[in-house]
Amino acid sequence: KEGAHMKKLTNYQRTAQYLNKVFKLINEEYFNNELEVPTITIQSTVGAYGHVSVNKVWHNDTVATHELNLSADYLNRPIENIVATLIHEGCHLYALQNNIKDTSNRGIYHNKRFKALAEERGLQISRHETYGWTITEPTEKTLDFCIINQLEDIQIVRQTAYSIGISGGKAGSGSAPIARPKKPSSTRKYICPCCGNSFR
Protein backbone atom coordinates (compact mmCIF):
# COMPACT_ATOMS: atom_id res chain seq x y z
CA LYS A 1 0.00 0.00 0.00
CA GLU A 2 1.14 3.51 -0.75
CA GLY A 3 2.21 5.53 2.25
CA ALA A 4 1.59 9.14 3.09
CA HIS A 5 4.95 10.04 1.52
CA MET A 6 4.04 8.94 -1.99
CA LYS A 7 5.30 11.30 -4.66
CA LYS A 8 2.64 13.10 -6.65
CA LEU A 9 1.62 11.37 -9.83
CA THR A 10 2.82 14.07 -12.20
CA ASN A 11 5.26 11.92 -14.17
CA TYR A 12 4.27 9.66 -17.07
CA GLN A 13 6.53 6.72 -16.16
CA ARG A 14 5.47 6.80 -12.50
CA THR A 15 1.82 7.00 -13.56
CA ALA A 16 2.18 3.98 -15.88
CA GLN A 17 3.72 1.94 -13.04
CA TYR A 18 1.01 3.15 -10.67
CA LEU A 19 -1.78 2.04 -13.03
CA ASN A 20 -0.27 -1.45 -13.16
CA LYS A 21 -0.24 -1.51 -9.36
CA VAL A 22 -3.88 -0.33 -9.20
CA PHE A 23 -4.90 -3.00 -11.73
CA LYS A 24 -3.18 -5.66 -9.61
CA LEU A 25 -5.19 -4.50 -6.56
CA ILE A 26 -8.41 -4.54 -8.63
CA ASN A 27 -7.66 -8.03 -9.96
CA GLU A 28 -7.17 -9.26 -6.39
CA GLU A 29 -10.21 -7.51 -4.88
CA TYR A 30 -12.79 -7.83 -7.65
CA PHE A 31 -11.66 -10.77 -9.81
CA ASN A 32 -10.04 -13.16 -7.31
CA ASN A 33 -6.74 -12.79 -9.26
CA GLU A 34 -8.36 -14.64 -12.18
CA LEU A 35 -7.64 -12.02 -14.84
CA GLU A 36 -4.68 -12.49 -17.12
CA VAL A 37 -2.58 -9.37 -16.65
CA PRO A 38 -3.00 -7.10 -19.70
CA THR A 39 -0.47 -4.69 -21.10
CA ILE A 40 -1.67 -1.34 -19.77
CA THR A 41 -1.20 1.57 -22.15
CA ILE A 42 -1.91 5.28 -21.90
CA GLN A 43 -2.93 6.72 -25.27
CA SER A 44 -5.55 9.14 -26.47
CA THR A 45 -8.85 7.41 -27.19
CA VAL A 46 -11.31 9.79 -28.81
CA GLY A 47 -14.65 9.68 -27.02
CA ALA A 48 -13.70 7.01 -24.47
CA TYR A 49 -12.11 6.74 -21.06
CA GLY A 50 -10.59 3.37 -21.93
CA HIS A 51 -10.74 0.22 -24.00
CA VAL A 52 -9.55 -3.36 -23.97
CA SER A 53 -8.44 -5.25 -27.07
CA VAL A 54 -10.47 -8.28 -28.13
CA ASN A 55 -7.31 -10.08 -29.22
CA LYS A 56 -3.96 -10.47 -27.52
CA VAL A 57 -2.10 -7.75 -29.40
CA TRP A 58 1.09 -7.49 -27.30
CA HIS A 59 3.67 -10.27 -27.83
CA ASN A 60 7.13 -11.23 -26.66
CA ASP A 61 9.00 -14.53 -27.01
CA THR A 62 6.80 -16.36 -24.50
CA VAL A 63 3.65 -14.37 -23.72
CA ALA A 64 0.83 -12.63 -25.56
CA THR A 65 -1.46 -10.20 -23.73
CA HIS A 66 -4.54 -8.09 -24.25
CA GLU A 67 -4.15 -4.33 -24.26
CA LEU A 68 -6.01 -2.30 -21.65
CA ASN A 69 -5.77 1.36 -22.58
CA LEU A 70 -6.68 4.33 -20.43
CA SER A 71 -7.22 7.51 -22.36
CA ALA A 72 -4.40 9.98 -21.76
CA ASP A 73 -6.93 12.79 -22.20
CA TYR A 74 -8.86 11.85 -19.04
CA LEU A 75 -6.19 10.64 -16.59
CA ASN A 76 -6.78 13.53 -14.20
CA ARG A 77 -10.31 12.46 -13.26
CA PRO A 78 -10.83 11.54 -9.59
CA ILE A 79 -9.13 8.23 -8.77
CA GLU A 80 -12.46 6.52 -8.07
CA ASN A 81 -13.44 7.22 -11.71
CA ILE A 82 -10.13 5.81 -12.98
CA VAL A 83 -10.69 2.73 -10.81
CA ALA A 84 -14.27 2.40 -12.16
CA THR A 85 -12.89 2.47 -15.72
CA LEU A 86 -10.28 -0.18 -14.85
CA ILE A 87 -12.98 -2.39 -13.30
CA HIS A 88 -15.20 -1.81 -16.38
CA GLU A 89 -12.41 -2.93 -18.69
CA GLY A 90 -11.57 -5.78 -16.29
CA CYS A 91 -15.14 -7.01 -16.74
CA HIS A 92 -14.55 -7.17 -20.50
CA LEU A 93 -11.33 -9.15 -19.90
CA TYR A 94 -13.19 -11.49 -17.56
CA ALA A 95 -15.89 -12.00 -20.19
CA LEU A 96 -13.27 -12.71 -22.89
CA GLN A 97 -11.50 -15.27 -20.69
CA ASN A 98 -14.74 -17.00 -19.74
CA ASN A 99 -16.46 -16.96 -23.16
CA ILE A 100 -19.21 -14.66 -21.92
CA LYS A 101 -20.78 -12.58 -24.69
CA ASP A 102 -20.99 -9.23 -22.89
CA THR A 103 -21.31 -7.06 -26.01
CA SER A 104 -23.03 -7.25 -29.37
CA ASN A 105 -23.02 -5.26 -32.59
CA ARG A 106 -19.28 -5.87 -33.05
CA GLY A 107 -18.41 -4.89 -29.49
CA ILE A 108 -20.34 -1.63 -29.53
CA TYR A 109 -23.47 -2.50 -27.54
CA HIS A 110 -22.94 -3.49 -23.88
CA ASN A 111 -25.64 -6.01 -22.95
CA LYS A 112 -27.22 -7.13 -19.68
CA ARG A 113 -24.48 -9.72 -19.13
CA PHE A 114 -21.96 -6.88 -19.03
CA LYS A 115 -24.22 -4.93 -16.68
CA ALA A 116 -24.41 -7.92 -14.32
CA LEU A 117 -20.63 -8.46 -14.35
CA ALA A 118 -19.98 -4.79 -13.56
CA GLU A 119 -22.67 -4.48 -10.90
CA GLU A 120 -21.38 -7.64 -9.19
CA ARG A 121 -18.15 -5.69 -8.78
CA GLY A 122 -19.81 -2.69 -7.19
CA LEU A 123 -20.16 -0.36 -10.16
CA GLN A 124 -23.26 1.65 -10.97
CA ILE A 125 -24.28 0.93 -14.55
CA SER A 126 -26.82 2.95 -16.52
CA ARG A 127 -28.12 2.52 -20.04
CA HIS A 128 -26.97 4.64 -22.95
CA GLU A 129 -29.49 4.79 -25.79
CA THR A 130 -26.97 3.74 -28.44
CA TYR A 131 -24.27 1.82 -26.55
CA GLY A 132 -26.38 -0.11 -24.04
CA TRP A 133 -25.36 -0.74 -20.43
CA THR A 134 -22.13 1.21 -20.68
CA ILE A 135 -22.46 4.32 -18.52
CA THR A 136 -20.21 3.45 -15.59
CA GLU A 137 -19.97 5.30 -12.32
CA PRO A 138 -18.14 4.52 -9.09
CA THR A 139 -20.11 3.73 -5.95
CA GLU A 140 -19.37 3.98 -2.23
CA LYS A 141 -17.80 0.52 -2.54
CA THR A 142 -15.42 1.86 -5.20
CA LEU A 143 -14.58 4.87 -3.05
CA ASP A 144 -13.97 2.63 -0.01
CA PHE A 145 -11.59 0.51 -2.12
CA CYS A 146 -9.66 3.67 -3.05
CA ILE A 147 -9.49 4.86 0.57
CA ILE A 148 -8.46 1.47 2.02
CA ASN A 149 -5.69 1.16 -0.58
CA GLN A 150 -4.69 4.83 -0.17
CA LEU A 151 -5.06 5.46 -3.90
CA GLU A 152 -4.38 8.99 -5.03
CA ASP A 153 -5.51 11.09 -7.96
CA ILE A 154 -3.31 11.17 -11.04
CA GLN A 155 -2.17 14.70 -11.77
CA ILE A 156 -0.95 14.38 -15.31
CA VAL A 157 -3.08 14.57 -18.44
CA ARG A 158 -2.46 14.82 -22.16
CA GLN A 159 -4.04 17.96 -23.52
CA THR A 160 -5.04 17.68 -27.14
CA ALA A 161 -7.45 19.53 -29.37
CA TYR A 162 -10.00 17.00 -28.13
CA SER A 163 -9.38 17.45 -24.41
CA ILE A 164 -8.63 21.15 -24.00
CA GLY A 165 -11.56 23.07 -22.62
CA ILE A 166 -13.75 20.08 -21.85
CA SER A 167 -13.63 20.31 -18.08
CA GLY A 168 -16.36 18.10 -16.78
CA GLY A 169 -16.74 16.53 -20.21
CA LYS A 170 -17.90 12.94 -20.28
CA ALA A 171 -17.04 10.00 -22.44
CA GLY A 172 -16.86 6.26 -22.59
CA SER A 173 -17.31 4.36 -19.37
CA GLY A 174 -18.81 7.32 -17.56
CA SER A 175 -21.41 8.89 -19.80
CA ALA A 176 -22.36 9.72 -23.35
CA PRO A 177 -19.67 10.17 -25.98
CA ILE A 178 -18.05 13.57 -26.35
CA ALA A 179 -18.93 15.51 -29.47
CA ARG A 180 -15.81 15.78 -31.65
CA PRO A 181 -14.96 17.77 -34.74
CA LYS A 182 -15.54 15.48 -37.70
CA LYS A 183 -13.34 14.96 -40.72
CA PRO A 184 -15.03 14.31 -44.06
CA SER A 185 -15.22 10.60 -44.81
CA SER A 186 -16.94 8.43 -47.36
CA THR A 187 -17.38 5.64 -44.81
CA ARG A 188 -18.95 5.57 -41.37
CA LYS A 189 -16.67 4.93 -38.42
CA TYR A 190 -18.09 3.89 -35.06
CA ILE A 191 -16.11 3.95 -31.83
CA CYS A 192 -17.27 2.17 -28.68
CA PRO A 193 -17.21 4.78 -25.92
CA CYS A 194 -16.01 2.18 -23.38
CA CYS A 195 -13.58 -0.11 -25.10
CA GLY A 196 -12.56 2.33 -27.85
CA ASN A 197 -12.70 -0.28 -30.61
CA SER A 198 -13.51 1.32 -33.94
CA PHE A 199 -15.56 -0.24 -36.68
CA ARG A 200 -16.24 0.84 -40.27
Question: What annotation goes with each model-predicted range?
Answer:
Residues A84-Q97:
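Active-site recognition of the HExxH zinc-binding catalytic motif
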Residues S53-N55, I82-T85:
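Surface-exposed beta-strand edges and their flanking turn/coil or helix-capping segments
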Residues K7-N76, Q97-R200:
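Metalloprotease/metallohydrolase-associated module, dominated by Zn2+-dependent proteases
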